[in-house]
Amino acid sequence: MNGERIFAVDAWSDVAITRHQARRLAREHGVEPRRAGEVAIVVSELASNIVKYGVRGEIALHVAAAIDGGLELTVVASDVGPPIHDLATAMLDGHDDRGPIDPALLAQRGGLGTGLGAVARLADGLEVRQESGGKQIIATFCRGLPGGA
């Protein structure tokens, strides 16, 4: 029951396509609709961040057997954009990686500064890898997947 799909993310239309395909992949593997929706939200947030902050990137979706016999779905967002300056701050709602977001700038930013926090709340695991050539954000889902806890 393994599967992998990779989507280039360069434009806003890619965000919608990737979100739809993530939900579809989850449902094809028996994930309940609500949990599949949470996977789609995570993919949407990560893909949106690639478009907003990255130079170019991709979303990879992996489905594999978990150690407990259930499924594990992993979302890997990779880009060659700038590093996240302060990850702990970026995870706070209403903040970017430099600090609180000025409410007067919300409309031009295209977001409320809740994306990474939402990813952390919805996924069962979150890892951020930053290197000189870019970064990867890895969100893992196992809770609520077929055969899992």
PLM segments and residue spans:
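Conserved ATP-binding N-box helix of the HATPase_c
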Residues: 33-60
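Bergerat-fold GHKL ATPase/HATPase_c domain
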Residues: 1-41, 63
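Short beta-strand-loop-beta element adjacent to the nucleotide/active-site pocket used for signaling
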Residues: 63-75
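A general secondary-structure signal for short beta-strands and their flanking turns/coil
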Residues: 2, 54, 70-72, 134
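Flexible ATP-lid and adjacent glycine-rich G1/G2 motifs of the Bergerat
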Residues: 80-149
